[in-house]
Amino acid sequence: SKIGINGFGRIGRLVLRAALEMGAQVVAVNDPFIALEYMVYMFKYDSTHGMFKGEVKAEDGALVVDGKKITVFNEMKPENIPWSKAGAEYIVESTGVFTTIEKASAHFKGGAKKVIISAPSADAPMFVCGVNLEKYSKDMKVVSNASCTTNCLAPVAKVLHENFEIVEGLMTTVHAVTATQKTVDGPSAKDWRGGRGAAQNIIPSSTGAAKAVGKVIPELDGKLTGMAFRVPTPNVSVVDLTVRLGKECSYDDIKAAMKAASEGPLQGVLGYTEDDVVSCDFTGDNRSSIFDAKAGIQLSKTFVKVVSWYDNEFGYSQRVIDLIKHMQKVDSA
């Protein structure tokens, strides 16, 4: 089945890279603010992930990547995008604007069959690869791939809960800057702190990522909450999860459980490292979450802090494609 991308921002462009890498077919891109020639440039050059290795060009009004033709639309409203013209059925909604079932459903007018929101959603069912994909059923038309932070936290929480039972926990994500922030102090009426200069501040912020884990792991509903610090790095973030456990264990027990999961059921989603790593070491890492065995600490047999890294752009974009591939498998069964 063919994929369309609405919104050619950080995630939209990296979803296209991920699709090419993973053998998924993107046939259309819509963005009202980016002309075709500029799309070529923005896709080719990336300050964080480097230059695209293949060939990118504009040809006959289409974006051509490695010889594959991608139809380009410049529609402002989702209901006006003629997806069926390009044969696009699975739409990645990565504008960050149409994040509810009602708003995302506008894509169906132009021929879309399914919509995958690349952000948390207030009402669409949320999926995290490695955690709750089995809950997807073909009658679901609009789904959410949750947030990059939920994708990092949920696999770690799953392993902890299944092995040692999470009683309650608090999460902090030390998060790289994103497009919504300001380069210097500027207006941000809904989030005053968020309007302060991104390059010169550590900015406390809210995040629904921890609460969202309760949506993908129902047994943890109401047991986790969290906040964020936005820091002046361009990419790669880290989750710090402090939990009270129901079963006594040593920190070595936790390490062993994480390592086993990373080599078994969560391979490709959860990573494990005992190296002396720092954030840059995870640029371009396509896993959702990499458990840092050396960074975690334990106070008592039931009170621990675990640390896990994630490339908040790249790993997440790969999961969008993984989710679509799973949906296609279920839908065609």
From Swiss-Prot:
Entries under InterPro entries matching the protein: GlycerAld/Erythrose_P_DH, GlycerAld_3-P_DH_AS, GlycerAld_3-P_DH_cat, GlycerAld_3-P_DH_NAD(P)-bd, Glyceraldehyde-3-P_DH_1, NAD(P)-bd_dom_sf
Active-site positions on this chain: C148
Domain of life per record: Eukaryota
Compartments, record wording: Cytoplasm
Annotated EC: 1.2.1.12
Family matches, as SUPFAM superfamilies: Glyceraldehyde-3-phosphate dehydrogenase-like, C-terminal domain (SSF55347), NAD(P)-binding Rossmann-fold domains (SSF51735)
Site annotation Activates thiol group during catalysis: residues: H175
Cellular component terms per the entry's GO annotation: cytosol
Principal place of residence: cytoplasm
Chain residues that bind D-glyceraldehyde 3-phosphate: S147, C148, T149, T178, T207, G208, R230
Pathway(s): Carbohydrate degradation; glycolysis; pyruvate from D-glyceraldehyde 3-phosphate: step 1/5
Endpoints of the signal sequence: none
GO molecular function, one term: NADP binding
Residues where NAD(+) binds: R10, I11, D31, M76, N312
Gene Ontology annotations of biological process type: glucose metabolic process; glycolytic process
Sites bearing N-acetylserine, chain numbering: S1
Keywords from the UniProt entry: Acetylation, Cytoplasm, Glycolysis, NAD, Oxidoreductase
Family matches, as CDD domains: GAPDH_I_C (cd18126), GAPDH_I_N (cd05214)
Catalytic activity reported: D-glyceraldehyde 3-phosphate + phosphate + NAD(+) = (2R)-3-phospho-glyceroyl phosphate + NADH + H(+)
PANTHER family cross-referenced by the UniProt entry: GLYCERALDEHYDE 3-PHOSPHATE DEHYDROGENASE, GLYCERALDEHYDE-3-PHOSPHATE DEHYDROGENASE-RELATED
Known partners and oligomeric status: Homotetramer.
Protein family membership: Belongs to the glyceraldehyde-3-phosphate dehydrogenase family.
Protein name: Glyceraldehyde-3-phosphate dehydrogenase
